[in-house]
């Protein structure tokens, strides 16, 4: 079984009820953090997960709302782990990730220096191990495998999605994307698809062109549902709601998805959990 927790279901626009985009995936005793939007560690703490328990950080792309708390994750993992030899944090993301991580650590260089000077058991900066990928298998430990596939969030490029598998259960995390062949291939036959969504009907009615531009490179609720249907997934999990999902609107969003996808649809607030069991997907892709 794989457990998916929507840590942050918000967007770039600050929302008092929603943290920034981030999803926690637990499988085979391992814990994967997918993106790290604002407030991610507070939300992780609410489900009993600390920064020092993260097996790997997976980044779908380098938009600010998806990496806003990267520095907090790196520093907090470092200072809250008391093992004598802290292993590097695996960080897997698209090309450009290494530069972002390097610059983030530079931004915290004063803080890092203060802590090394103060604490005898902190002798080196936060250890990281960055892998930049666009396609292929990136993880295979203790019967958990992770595969990466390309998505389409242009002009943001390259962007990637992740497929996590464990003992016959599988979850795909799409990140921000429009419908594309790469995501269809990655999600084919998966137990669950976690997909960011927008309400195109609401956004296109707004007067600000910069806001309407969002429609260019995000999937609408209906498009995400169509992707799930084409891929034959068992559960569609919606997140990253734009505009923000207001209390009482859940059924409206779910109904839109249900016009294009006739299986289980999950939508909710931060900390919403979904269990994905082996064999949950009974439909072939196509």
Curated annotation (Swiss-Prot):
Disulfide bonds: none annotated. It is an enzyme of class 3 (hydrolase). The keyword Transmembrane does not apply. SUPFAM superfamilies: Metallo-hydrolase/oxidoreductase. Zn(2+) 2 binds at residues 65-66, 176, 240. Zn(2+) 1 binds at residues 61, 63, 153, 176. Binds 2 Zn(2+) ions. The keyword rRNA-binding does not apply. Keywords: Endonuclease, Hydrolase, Metal-binding, Nuclease, tRNA processing, Zinc. Its cofactor is Zn(2+). It holds the Pfam family Lactamase_B_2. InterPro entries: AtsA-like_MBL-fold, Metallo-B-lactamas, RibonucZ/Hydroxyglut_hydro, RNase_Z/BN. It catalyses: Endonucleolytic cleavage of RNA, removing extra 3' nucleotides from tRNA precursor, generating 3' termini of tRNAs. A 3'-hydroxy group is left at the tRNA terminus and a 5'-phosphoryl group is left at the trailer molecule. The active site is at 65 (proton acceptor). GO terms for molecular function: 3'-tRNA processing endoribonuclease activity; metal ion binding. Its EC number is 3.1.26.11. SMART domains: Lactamase_B (SM00849). It comes from the Bacteria. Belongs to the RNase Z family. Zinc phosphodiesterase, which displays some tRNA 3'-processing endonuclease activity. Probably involved in tRNA maturation, by removing a 3'-trailer from precursor tRNA. Homodimer. PANTHER family: ZINC PHOSPHODIESTERASE ELAC PROTEIN 1. HAMAP family: RNase_Z_BN (MF_01818). This is Ribonuclease Z. It comes from Mycolicibacterium gilvum (strain PYR-GCK) (Mycobacterium gilvum (strain PYR-GCK)). The lineage of its organism: Bacteria, Bacillati, Actinomycetota, Actinomycetes, Mycobacteriales. The gene is rnz.
């Amino acid at each position: 079984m794989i457990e998916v927790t929507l840590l942050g279901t918000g967007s770039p626009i600050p929302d008092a009820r929603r943290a920034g985009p981030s999803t926690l995936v637990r499988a085979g005793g391992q814990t994967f953090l997918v993106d790290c939007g604002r407030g991610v560690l507070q939300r992780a703490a609410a489900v009993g997960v600390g920064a020092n328990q993260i097996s790997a950080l997976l980044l779908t792309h380098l938009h600010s709302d998806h990496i806003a708390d990267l520095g907090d994750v790196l520093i907090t993992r470092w200072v809250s782990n008391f093992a004598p030899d802290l292993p590097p944090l695996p960080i897997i993301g698209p090309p450009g990730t290494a530069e972002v991580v390097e610059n983030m650590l530079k931004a915290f260089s004063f803080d890092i220096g203060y802590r090394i000077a103060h604490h005898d058991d902190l002798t080196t900066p936060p250890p990281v191990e960055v892998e930049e990928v666009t396609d292929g298998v990136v993880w295979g430990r203790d019967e958990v495998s992770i595969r990466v596939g390309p998505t389409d969030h242009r002009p943001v490029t390259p962007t990637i999605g992740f497929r996590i598998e464990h003992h016959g259960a599988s979850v795909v995390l799409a990140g921000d994307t429009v419908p594309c062949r790469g995501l269809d291939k990655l999600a084919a036959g998966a137990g669950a698809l976690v997909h960011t969504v927008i309400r195109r009907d609401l956004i296109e009615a707004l007067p600000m062109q910069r806001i309407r531009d969002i429609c260019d490179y995000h999937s609408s609720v209906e498009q995400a549902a169509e992707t799930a249907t084409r891929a034959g997934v068992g559960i569609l999990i919606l997140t990253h709601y734009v505009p923000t999902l207001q209390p009482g609107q859940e059924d409206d969003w779910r109904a839109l998805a249900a016009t294009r996808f006739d299986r289980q649809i999950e939508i909710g607030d931060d900390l919403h959990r979904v269990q994905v069991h082996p064999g949950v997907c009974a439909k072939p892709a196509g």
